[in-house]
């Protein structure tokens, strides 16, 4: 018995021994592989949930633990580390990066989000740090130069005109839609919905580029997919409130064109020297009537420094069952044209709930209200030249005229003999205002009845109501002639979407992993428009539609609708974590085509080889990651009118005193999908633990293009839409990023993107080799990209100072410069200029760096091989033809008998410069798109109080520098020509971000 008691006592002492071990204080630091401190890391005693601490800002910690215990250190983004105490007083830890944790999970289709390393498709992601605090009102503008192969060009800098032109891997169709599909949180949406979002609500933007990534979206993904994920709250997170504010000014990005116009003295001197007007004529027409001012009109027609500000408030957090994010924003920008402004208000609510282990649901809704007032004639040629001073061509007004009257008020009269009105006065009395009410969002339910089997049902809507009011004030027309006009219009547009998917993820063994997805999607698009207008109002106080004359009242109404129905499936298979394969199939049906041809099947196959996991590379330290990707698939394009396949009739003139009708559009029951095949291969990876790269080649072939084909004159129809012709785009994408410097409290990184795209028309219609479009100054030529077709300017004849043009050869598709003529014939002299309509090269680069709390980032974007016809130059470069307009200083270099090598002709002979290649300018450019300087206050300075957790001060600039040879208003405009458009704007903004 005694032996038994001794044995029990001994065992109790052995068990209790550790409990009586002596506690000692252990301290040390936790750093990463670069030697930088890791603040907030958890340092815990192994086996205990109550003994532990968190590292300070400098990575240090201090903790009292048993001398024979073990410390465990963990932090998000790093692998867990542990070390026995063994009586030591100092223990330092170096944490290794955990690539699996650091890697971002993104959504690329209808299923669960995936980590980038497991995605076979080509996907480029831009995070919120690049997008937030954007000076532009559009988040899409921030993508310029950020994604290889994605071309983003801004239309203008007019407040409220935040549209951009976006194409991926070239222009994939000659006449059907060429814009990507926009998806917001899983719901296909319009570009308008994206542009009416607050950029600070966006978590990330993923651009899906190859067939493996896009084929799941079928017919709408022929031009790529831009997937936008908005911010959301996190479960088990304390509530936080973040305020962001930005205040600054905007102005024209470039005023060099306006500054190159002549002053009054320069213009009058030029007229006399060039033999356009005599001094006597100038005296009698201007000076004797008191018109001896020197007005720089662009300074009066534009407000060059305008306020811009934005205020955001975000509340986010979550408990064990609910996560939430609520954000409100207000944005204001005053434009540089008189009366122009843009106001936007948004409210976003993103709430997710996990009430049961097998049930998840959520609501994500964005409401927006915007109000825009614009100059109705800015950039428009609707009124011809009679009102050219009302908009973007106002700088052509003669500088001898006054902008203000003798009382310092805006000059309200017509200038004698000119039929011209002061631009400011004209715009102030021609009001054009838009109110837009938008809603975009979705509701989803996710059920997981058994582990890894998920059923998801999602309903979404993207819609808006737009109200437009326009009027020409009666008091204005009473003083200047004409007729008052008042009009109102309303438009309603929405797209309703419902998606149901089932997804099952499983593995047979550790070497064989599968994910299977099947789904259904239905989309309904609807648009309706109504307008009413009248004229003849006589009093500003009674300027309503019903105050106009009875015979002037006009009412119009229209509507349009379309539907899509789709079924799809997707399979992912991973073999030994080294070989990943995916396959997609989708059937789409569209109401835009006849019932016999409206269904189409699209598919893709893709594979990825994770080379780094092979034995021959596993131990090669210079290679951190290396992946080879290959994919091929098909997509469709239905980007045409909703009723292009139907036979339509329209009203025409009277016959036998009865209203007549005519065939406006012939029926085409065989009209069907434009098709595309896309092959992509890529090599991605990381070398030497500092160089990230992504090299990609693509071949994109479009067939059965949706083209408006000319019809015989005897048919009475100009053109009809048919499936004809084919087009090819091929090219390379290069994305590089590497660390220049990285130390304990400083860093510097360089990133760059590059795309080269080769376009080629491979087939037209009716056996044609060339299809010139003279009014657009371009032509489609088999075997070539879309080319500029113009008369080719041959310079000035040194003998007589008259302009010359090259005579085309037998084949106008080949540039010929052998013979010249001085007799201009537009179509007869038109030939291939050798200049491409679409730029083959675009990209960008950024340099970012930081030291402690200070950070700087500069983003540049560029386009090479871009050309624009400067239509404006036809007016300011033709002083003999437009002798009552101002002109550019450059035309002073004109021909005289003593100056025979001049760039411009002998104006005294009435020489006229024509629409030819002298107006076709190189519009390639390099632009400092964004510059951001930020400073985050050290937490030690905030430690004296508990309210403010983080405080950041920022300075942001946009479009600060532009390098280009283009002499027009702005080289970034995506068009074949420019005419009176508003150039891009430049912003300077200061900001503050406070987190409570």
Set out the residue ranges of the language-model regions.
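Outer-membrane beta-barrel "beta-signal"
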Residues: 604-608, 733-736, 931, 984-996
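Glycine-centered tight-turn and secondary-structure capping sites
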Residues: 680-684
């Amino acid at each position: 018995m005694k032996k038994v008691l001794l044995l029990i006592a001994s065992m109790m002492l052995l068990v209790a021994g550790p409990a009586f071990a002596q506690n000692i204080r252990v301290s040390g630091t936790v750093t990463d592989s670069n030697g930088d401190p890791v603040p907030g890391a958890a340092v815990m005693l192994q086996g205990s949930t109550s003994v532990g601490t968190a590292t300070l800002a400098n990575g240090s910690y201090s903790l009292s633990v048993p001398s024979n215990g073990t410390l465990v250190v963990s932090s998000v983004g790093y692998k867990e580390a542990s070390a026995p105490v063994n009586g030591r007083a100092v223990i330092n830890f170096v944490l290794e990066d955990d690539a699996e944790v650091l890697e971002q999970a993104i959504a690329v289709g209808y299923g669960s989000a995936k980590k980038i390393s497991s995605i076979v498709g080509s996907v480029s992601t831009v995070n919120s740090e690049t997008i937030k605090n954007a000076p532009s009102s559009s988040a899409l503008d921030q993508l310029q130069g950020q994604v290889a192969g994605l071309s983003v060009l801004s239309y203008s800098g007019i407040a409220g005109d935040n549209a951009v032109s976006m194409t991926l891997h070239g222009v994939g169709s000659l006449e059907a839609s060429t814009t990507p599909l926009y998806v917001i949180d899983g719901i296909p949406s319009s570009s308008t919905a994206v542009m009416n979002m607050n950029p600070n609500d966006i978590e990330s933007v993923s651009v899906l580029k190859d067939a493996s990534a896009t084929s799941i979206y079928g017919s709408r993904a022929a031009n790529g997919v831009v997937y936008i994920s908005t911010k959301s709250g996190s479960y088990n997170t304390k509530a936080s409130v973040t305020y962001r504010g930005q205040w600054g000014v905007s102005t024209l990005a470039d005023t060099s064109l306006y500054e190159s116009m002549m002053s009054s003295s320069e213009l009058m001197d030029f007229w006399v020297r060039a033999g356009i007007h005599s001094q006597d004529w100038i005296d009698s027409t201007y000076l004797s009537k008191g018109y001896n001012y020197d007005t720089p009109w662009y300074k009066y027609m534009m407000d060059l420094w305008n306020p811009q500000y934005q205020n955001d408030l975000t509340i986010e957090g979550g408990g064990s069952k609910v996560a939430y994010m609520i954000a409100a924003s207000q944005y204001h920008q005053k434009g540089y044209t008189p009366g122009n402004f843009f106001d936007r208000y948004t409210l976003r609510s993103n709430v997710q709930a996990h009430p049961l282990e097998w049930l998840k649901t959520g609501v994500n809704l964005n409401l927006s209200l915007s109000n825009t007032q614009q100059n109705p004639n800015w950039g428009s040629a609707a009124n011809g030249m009679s009102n050219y001073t009302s908009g973007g061509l106002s700088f052509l007004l003669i500088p001898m005229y006054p902008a203000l009257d003798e009382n310092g008020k805006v000059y309200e009269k017509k200038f004698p003999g000119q039929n011209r009105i002061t631009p400011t006065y004209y715009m102030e009395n021609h009001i054009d205002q838009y109110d837009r009410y938008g809603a975009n969002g979705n509701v989803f339910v996710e059920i997981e009845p058994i582990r890894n089997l998920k059923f998801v049902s999602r309903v979404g809507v993207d819609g808006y109501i737009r109200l437009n009011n326009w009027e020409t004030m009666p008091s204005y027309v009473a003083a200047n002639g004409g007729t008052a006009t008042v009009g109102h219009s309303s438009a309603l547009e929405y797209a309703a979407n419902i998606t149901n998917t089932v997804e099952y993820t499983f593995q047979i063994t550790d070497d064989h992993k599968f994910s299977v997805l099947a789904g259904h999607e239905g989309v309904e698009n609807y648009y309706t428009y109504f307008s009413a207008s009248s004229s003849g109002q006589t009093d500003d106080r009674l300027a309503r539609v019903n105050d106009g004359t009875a015979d002037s009242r006009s009412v119009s109404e229209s509507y349009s609708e379309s539907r899509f129905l789709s079924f799809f499936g997707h399979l992912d298979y991973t073999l030994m974590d080294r070989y990943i394969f995916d396959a997609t199939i989708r059937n789409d049906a569209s109401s835009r085509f006849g019932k016999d041809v409206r269904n189409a099947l699209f598919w893709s196959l893709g594979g990825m080889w994770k080379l780094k996991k092979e034995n021959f590379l596993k131990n090669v330290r210079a290679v951190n990651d290396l992946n080879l990707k290959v994919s091929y698939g098909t997509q469709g394009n239905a980007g045409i009118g909703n009723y292009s396949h139907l036979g339509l009739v329209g009203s025409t003139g009277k016959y036998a005193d009865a209203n007549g009708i005519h065939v406006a559009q012939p029926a085409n029951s065989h009209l069907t999908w434009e098709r595309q095949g896309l092959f992509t291969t890529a090599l991605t990876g990381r070398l030497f633990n500092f160089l990230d790269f992504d090299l990609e080649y693509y071949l994109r072939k479009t067939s059965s293009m949706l083209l408006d084909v000319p019809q015989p004159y005897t048919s009475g129809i100009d053109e009809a839409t048919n499936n004809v012709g084919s087009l090819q785009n091929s090219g390379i994408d290069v994305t590089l990023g590497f660390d220049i410097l990285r130390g304990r409290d400083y860093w510097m990184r360089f990133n760059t993107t590059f795309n080269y795209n080769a376009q080629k028309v491979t087939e037209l219609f009716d056996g044609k080799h060339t299809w010139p479009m003279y009014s657009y100054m371009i032509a489609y030529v088999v075997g070539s990209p879309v080319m500029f077709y113009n008369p080719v300017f041959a310079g000035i004849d040194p003998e007589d100072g008259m302009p010359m043009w090259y005579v085309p050869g037998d084949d106008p598709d080949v540039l010929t410069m052998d013979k010249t003529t001085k007799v201009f014939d537009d179509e007869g002299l038109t030939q291939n200029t050798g200049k491409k309509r679409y730029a083959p090269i675009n990209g960008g680069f950024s340099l970012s760096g930081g030291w402690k709390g200070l950070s700087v980032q500069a983003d540049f974007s560029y386009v090479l091989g871009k050309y624009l016809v400067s239509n404006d130059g036809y007016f300011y470069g033709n002083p003999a033809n437009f002798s009552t307009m101002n002109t550019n200083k450059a035309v002073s270099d004109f021909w005289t008998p003593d100056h025979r090598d001049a760039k411009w002709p002998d104006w005294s002979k009435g020489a006229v410069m024509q629409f030819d290649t002298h107006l076709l300018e190189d519009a390639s450019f390099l632009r400092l798109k964004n510059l951001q300087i930020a400073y985050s206050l050290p937490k030690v300075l905030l430690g004296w109080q508990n309210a403010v957790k983080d405080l950041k001060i920022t300075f942001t600039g946009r479009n600060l520098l532009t390098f280009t040879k283009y002499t027009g208003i702005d080289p970034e405009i995506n068009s074949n020509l420019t005419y009176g458009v508003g150039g891009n704007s430049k912003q300077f903004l200061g900001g503050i971000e406070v987190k409570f």
